[in-house]
Amino acid sequence: MIKKESFFTEYRVSAVPDEEYAKVSSYIDHFMRAFANTTYKSIYLIDYYKKTFLYVSDNPLFLCGLSPKDVKELGFDFYLNYVPYVEQKMLIEINHAGFQFIRTVEPEERYKYTISYSFHICPPHKEPLLINHKVTPVLLTTKGDIWLALCTAQLSSESASGHIEMTCQTNNKLWRLESGLWKEYPGVELTENERSMLRLTVGGLSIEKIADRLLRSAETIKSYRRFVFKKLEVGNITEAIMMAINKKLI
């Protein structure tokens, strides 16, 4: 049987004294509320030392019909209540693999890394939602352990759960978790014309109008689309836009 403690069997956080909590408590709530007001994503803050959620935004996507207070009080039990059992096991494997990866990174560099993956949440009496979930360290202990981490959730552009990636904000590399092992891949790069095509598409322009704006033919714009679909491993322009935004390519 999976329990909340299953998420922490391979990771122990060094002690965080009360005075450290006193330092951050005065501004964390204000900062998180301000951040929540600027994004369409659901956000929450994990405390790995106390094994709880410190903050949960009021975006309804992630709440499964609960209040932010309810989700905050549930903490990691939220996953056990609202994620399919087979994917609960996947989340635990991701948790363990993520911590194993981060141990290989120098403490001062750990803030730069983000793990991303997709899983289902099951709101009562509704169809399951496939969400993309990202976790980024926010504060470390004096010994370099991850103390607080920012989590974001949004609708996933994938077709199934999984697709586990680790990225670093200072380089174009990415690592994918495959059969329990991290495998390095080159990151996705778009040309300036491909990025412009996506931005103008987001702005509502048709292929013909994008062609006029970029001084290219409509067939050339269509070729940009095909290249983007291949690079991002998607099947249509909506998925391409979501993936490009998700990967911070536009």
For the regions a protein language model found, what residue spans apply to each?
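Short, low-complexity N-terminal regulatory "tails/caps" that precede and couple sensory modules
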Residues: M1-A22
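A cross-family signal for key residues in well-ordered alpha-helices
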Residues: I92, R199, D212, K230, ...
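Recognition helix of helix-turn-helix DNA-binding domains
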Residues: G204-E239
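Sensory/regulatory domains in signal-transduction proteins
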Residues: I46-K69, L74-G162
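PAS-family sensory domain signal
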Residues: Y21-F76, T170-E178
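Intrinsically disordered, low-complexity basic tails/linkers immediately adjacent to helix-turn-helix/homeobox/MYB/SANT
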Residues: M243-I250
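Short alpha-helical "packing" element that flanks the helix-turn-helix/winged-helix DNA-binding module
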Residues: E194-T201, A240
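Regulatory hinge/linker segments at domain boundaries
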Residues: T170-R195
